[in-house]
Amino acid sequence: MNTIPTRCLLGGLLALSLLAYAGEGDGTQHIVIDSGDTARSWEAARQSQEQWNATHGLRNKVNTRVEKDFDRYDQAVDLQEKCNSSQNVNAYWEPNTSRCLDRRTGRSLLAP
């Protein structure tokens, strides 16, 4: 006796639930395919390249300066050893100026 209204009620509920489910997803599902060639990505890549170039240039300057300082120090050590082992009795090493000087005249000795 109650089977027909129950079946109609269940069928109606099923139809309503399917309509409600189908209506929810209509406006929210979007598929965006981007090749990465947008203006924003080009600008970000350009800025990244500029920053890399700037840091690379600064690193090169720092490395060049360090090499020059090392070469100066290395040359000063060589001159000091040469001055201290010199046969000239009047030759002495001046550490403040990193030069080999003559005790009598105070002049720089080119070849100690």
From Swiss-Prot:
Transmembrane segments: none
Keywords: Signal
Signal peptide residue numbers: 1-22
A Pfam family recorded for this sequence: DUF1283
InterPro entries linked to this entry: DUF1283
Ribosomal protein in keyword set: no
Superkingdom: Bacteria
HAMAP family recorded: UPF0482
Family: Belongs to the UPF0482 family.
Name assigned to this protein: UPF0482 protein SG1468
